[in-house]
């Protein structure tokens, strides 16, 4: 160990003495949701400030990505998500430069899955959760990590606030419901992306804590009773309205159209239909040439109608004629 430290110090002193530019240190790729940032650390250099150039291999030719930058990072998010990529960086000072430092990077395998978004809604004694897959850098707004990995699922863990016991579930869809929780209790929930075929898990989201309430849902049997009672009351009300309208109709009809009563003898006559038939056929059919005179029957006064009993049977002698001998 002491020999290695001595060799490193000796190398640094030799580089400083000869004026050689040291290479960048701790070169690494920081990739989250395909936002690929190549990072490094600037080495100690006595002559002045260093600049850096970063390149990537494309069709067997290295292409510049960042040139003469004073930053210690370079954005490679435009690289294809699939396949291996060779990247390299070097330090530069004036016309001098260090050796290249190479790394190999495969975005689809090496990128870190960031925390998903989550929306939590409390409904009585349950928590309704909706998950949002992380978005991808330099892609359409609707393009998410779920579109890249076919086996994408979620890991959800929840616990009572203030306790250490955690429960985990694996939803297959973008939503999940935690039911039958204790009422008036605060629960905390976290979610992360998970790839079963790669056995790769993403980063946990920040905990979201919500308090449940009491289940005030009306039982189904009570709903049925209320519905039946409502139907009965409606039918009863309709029946009452119909009876009231019928009474009003009858009263109005009698008030504006009083009933005309027939004589008793006409009622009896019309009550026997066979009498009507006999009366109809008792009269002979009239001829078209028959002439009818109008006959009026006038009742005689009672005073003038009085006669002697003997007069009713005697025949008068016409004037001017005497008895025959």
From Swiss-Prot:
Keyword terms: Antiviral defense, Disulfide bond, Glycoprotein, Membrane, Receptor, Repeat, Signal, Transmembrane, Transmembrane helix
Gene Ontology CC entries for this record: interleukin-28 receptor complex; membrane; plasma membrane
Major subcellular site: membrane
Domain of life from the UniProt record: Eukaryota
Polar residues: compositionally biased ranges: 305-315
Residue ranges of the region described as Disordered: 301-325
InterPro entries per the UniProt record, alphabetical: FN3_dom, FN3_sf, Ig-like_fold, Interferon/interleukin_rcp_dom, Type-II_Cytokine-TF_Rcpt
Transmembrane segments: 221-242
Stated consequence of mutating residue 47 to E: Risk factor for HBV infection; higher cell surface levels
Glycosylation sites: 49, 68, 102, 161
Location(s) in or outside the cell: Membrane
Keyword field contains Transmembrane helix: yes
GO molecular function: coreceptor activity; interleukin-10 receptor activity; signaling receptor activity
Extracellular topological domain: 20-220
Membrane topology: Single-pass type I membrane protein
SUPFAM superfamilies according to UniProt: Fibronectin type III
Coiled coil spans: none
Signal peptide: 1-19
Cytoplasmic domain ranges by topology: 243-325
Annotated disorder: Inflammatory bowel disease 25, autosomal recessive: A chronic, relapsing inflammation of the gastrointestinal tract with a complex etiology. It is subdivided into Crohn disease and ulcerative colitis phenotypes. Crohn disease may affect any part of the gastrointestinal tract from the mouth to the anus, but most frequently it involves the terminal ileum and colon. Bowel inflammation is transmural and discontinuous; it may contain granulomas or be associated with intestinal or perianal fistulas.
Membership in a protein family: Belongs to the type II cytokine receptor family.
Function: Shared cell surface receptor required for the activation of five class 2 cytokines: IL10, IL22, IL26, IL28, and IFNL1. The IFNLR1/IL10RB dimer is a receptor for the cytokine ligands IFNL2 and IFNL3 and mediates their antiviral activity. The ligand/receptor complex stimulate the activation of the JAK/STAT signaling pathway leading to the expression of IFN-stimulated genes (ISG), which contribute to the antiviral state.
Subunit annotation: Heterodimer with IFNLR1.
Protein name from the UniProt record: Interleukin-10 receptor subunit beta
Lineage: Eukaryota, Metazoa, Chordata, Craniata, Vertebrata
């Amino acid at each position: 160990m002491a020999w290695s430290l001595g060799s490193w110090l000796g190398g640094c002193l030799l580089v400083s003495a000869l004026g050689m530019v040291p290479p960048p240190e701790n070169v690494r790729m920081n990739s989250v949701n395909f936002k690929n940032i190549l990072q490094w650390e600037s080495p100690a250099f006595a002559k002045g400030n260093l600049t850096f150039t970063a390149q990537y291999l494309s069709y067997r030719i290295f292409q510049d990505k960042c040139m003469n930058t004073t930053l210690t990072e370079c954005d490679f998010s435009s690289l294809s998500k699939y396949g291996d990529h060779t990247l390299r960086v070097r330090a530069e000072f004036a016309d001098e430069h260090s050796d290249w430092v190479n790394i190999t990077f495969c975005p689809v395998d090496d990128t870190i899955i960031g925390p998903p978004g989550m929306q939590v809604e409390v409904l009585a004694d349950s928590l309704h959760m909706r998950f949002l897959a992380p978005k991808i850098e330099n892609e359409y707004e609707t393009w998410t990590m779920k579109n890249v990995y076919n086996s994408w699922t979620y890991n959800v863990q929840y616990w009572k606030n203030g306790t250490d016991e955690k429960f985990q579930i694996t939803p297959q869809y973008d939503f999940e419901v935690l039911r039958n929780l204790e009422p008036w209790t605060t629960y905390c929930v976290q979610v992360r992306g998970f790839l079963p075929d790669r056995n790769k898990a993403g980063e946990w989201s920040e905990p979201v804590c919500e308090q449940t309430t009491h289940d005030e849902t009306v039982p189904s049997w009570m709903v049925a009773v209320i519905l039946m009672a409502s139907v009965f009351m409606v039918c009863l009300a309709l029946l009452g309205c119909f009876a009231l309208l019928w009474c009003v109709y009858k009263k109005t009809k009698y008030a504006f159209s009083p009933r005309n009563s027939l004589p008793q003898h006409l009622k009896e006559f019309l009550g026997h239909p066979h009498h009507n038939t006999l009366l109809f056929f008792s009269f002979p059919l009239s001829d078209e040439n028959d002439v009818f005179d109008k006959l009026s029957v006038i009742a005689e006064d009672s005073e003038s109608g009085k006669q002697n009993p003997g007069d009713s049977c005697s025949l008068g002698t016409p004037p001017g004629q005497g008895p025959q001998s």
